[in-house]
Curated annotation (Swiss-Prot):
Its main location: cytoplasm. It comes from Rattus norvegicus. The keyword Protein transport applies. This is Signal transducing adapter molecule 2. Involved in intracellular signal transduction mediated by cytokines and growth factors. Upon IL-2 and GM-CSL stimulation, it plays a role in signaling leading to DNA synthesis and MYC induction. May also play a role in T-cell development. Involved in down-regulation of receptor tyrosine kinase via multivesicular body (MVBs) when complexed with HGS (ESCRT-0 complex). The ESCRT-0 complex binds ubiquitin and acts as a sorting machinery that recognizes ubiquitinated receptors and transfers them to further sequential lysosomal sorting/trafficking processes. The gene is Stam2.
């Protein structure tokens, strides 16, 4: 799919403004005017194609394009008037007049603008034509007056109408004469054969066709290369009248030769050369696909910098083509710049997000970990007895039922076990030498009836029992615990006497004066 769609009016406009045209083809011009209203965006495309021909370097082509422009303004209605009164058209008109085009082209364009300003002066939508004329007059450009323009336009229109009428009359007369000749030939042949032979010897002439010719009008003759044509009238230097097996009609004299001995091969070679030339011209006229080419832009800038502004010579065709291509690159360059800007914005947003993520990462790395606070709330579990700490075991002997109170059954002796030092002693407020004692419940002294006390005086207190069982290593309670231990005697007297368990008690240090400590409740 091409990047740019072809202008639907370009081919017809080029045909109507061909530099080889001798007169204006009004049938084609009116056909173009009719297509403007029926084609989508027709007014803009048609005006663009016309202005392209107005800027042609051949003045004859530019004058024909201005004639076509005037016909479109007069016949296409308001849609074409709005395009003529647009800013783009005003800019192109300024460029044509200020670039010092051919004087006849400039004068005709100025005359058309004055005529349009007079025609559109009552409609405020078309005031740009008058404003453009006024601005250019202030810049020193001269325009013809409205009165002289009206008179010259009327005279020109009248002359053109008369000329068209004369051409139509001549064409009708030629057609009638041809019909009369066709009707008279059979009668002449039947009535007077000698006169016919004399006429044929005098008028008829045979020629050979060099190229193919396809009839466009009804009164033209179609023939192929190499065919023999009988010439009936050669009074006109350009168009002859002749006949062949297809009929009779007019044909161009340059397409035939009077030399019947010309080899067909030579004509074929000439025809192939002509076809090659036509193909090359078509290829040149076909627009190349436009894309962003930095080389062409640099080349155009280099040519522009090398040109002398004071040089009166017109610009080369190569420069004009490069300028046209560079102008067509404009929208594509704008789209490319928009895409680059959009990608730059996306990358900028991504960069901001990456920086925010890095900042958050650094913040989290520099913060203190939460698990250190959590570990302080949960102390370590009890450890085994530290190595090197002596542990003494006090055996407890079970005694008979003489030491039981009334109604209390004997409890079997439990298995002996050892308790290590209390690991939580360091977190309390008691002195270090009292940790192991306060960590365990002290067995209250056994109080029995008087009979038991008499029979067994050695078991009055738990301390006396422990001293008798331990032998030399007697246990002496600390001073700060005596008051606490005595508070349990009243409650323990009603309980049955249980078998004692060996308790690990550290060796008490030498007696030292100690400060008073107060026990705090455990957490």
């Amino acid at each position: 799919m091409p990047l740019f769609t072809a202008n639907p009016f370009e081919q017809d406009v080029e045909k109507a403004t061909n530099e080889y045209n001798t007169t204006e083809d009004w049938s084609l011009i009116m056909d173009i005017c009719d297509r403007v209203g029926s084609t989508p965006n027709g007014a803009k495309d048609c005006l663009k194609a016309i202005m392209k021909r107005v800027n042609h370097k051949v003045p004859h082509v530019a004058l024909q394009a201005l004639t076509l422009l005037g016909a479109c303004v007069a016949n296409c209605g308001k849609i074409f008037h709005l395009e003529v009164c647009s800013r783009d058209f005003a800019t192109e008109v300024r460029a044509v007049i200020k670039n010092k085009a051919h004087p006849k082209v400039c004068e005709k364009l100025k005359s058309l603008m004055v005529e349009w300003s007079e025609e559109f002066q009552k409609d405020p939508q078309f005031s740009l034509i008058s404003a453009t004329i006024k601005a250019m007059k202030e810049e020193g450009v001269t325009f013809p007056s409205a009165g002289s323009q009206t008179v010259s336009a009327a005279a020109k229109n009248g002359a053109s109408l008369n000329k068209n009428k004369e051409d139509e009359d001549i064409a009708k007369a030629i057609e009638l004469s041809l019909q009369e000749q066709k009707q008279q030939y059979p009668e002449t042949k039947a009535l007077c054969p000698p006169a016919e032979s004399q006429l044929s010897n005098k008028v008829a002439r045979r020629v050979r066709a060099l190229y193919d010719f396809e009839a466009v009008e009804d009164n033209e003759l179609t023939f192929k290369h190499g065919e023999i044509i009988t010439v009936l009238d050669d009074s006109d230097a350009n168009w002859w009248e002749g006949e062949n097996h297809r009929g009779a009609g007019l044909f161009p004299s340059s397409f035939v030769t009077t030399d019947l001995s010309t080899e067909v091969e030579a004509a074929t070679v000439d025809k192939s050369n002509v076809i090659d030339d036509d193909v090359e011209e078509i290829k040149k006229s076909e627009p190349e696909p436009v894309y962003i080419d930095e080389g062409k832009m640099d080349r155009a800038l280099q040519i522009l910098q090398s040109i002398d502004p004071k040089d009166p010579k017109p610009d080369s065709q190569d420069l004009l083509d490069l300028e046209d291509i560079c102008q067509q690159m404009g929208p594509m360059i704008d789209e490319k710049l928009e895409e680059i800007d959009r990608r730059h914005s996306e990358l900028s947003e991504l960069n901001v997000k990456v920086l925010e993520a890095l900042e958050l990462y650094n913040k989290l790395v520099n913060e203190a970990p939460m698990y250190s606070v959590y570990s302080k709330l949960h102390p370590a579990p009890y450890s085994a007895t530290a190595a090197g700490v002596p542990v003494q075991t006090y055996p407890v002997q079970s005694h008979g039922g003489n030491y039981l109170g009334h109604g209390i059954h004997q409890v079997p002796v439990a298995q002996s076990y050892n308790l290590g030092p209390d690991p939580m002693g360091s977190s309390r407020s008691l002195p270090p030498n009292m940790n192991s004692v306060t960590a365990h419940t002290i067995q209250p002294p056994y109080l029995s009836t008087g009979q038991d006390a008499v029979s067994n005086p050695s078991y009055m207190t738990q301390s006396s029992h422990l001293q008798a069982a331990a032998g030399t290593a007697a246990y002496t309670p600390a001073m700060g615990v005596s008051a606490d231990l005595s508070s349990f005697q009243s409650t323990a007297s009603g309980l049955p006497q249980l078998a004692g368990f060996p308790v690990a008690v550290p060796v008490p240090p030498a007696p030292q004066p100690q400060a008073s400590y107060h026990q705090q409740p455990l957490l």
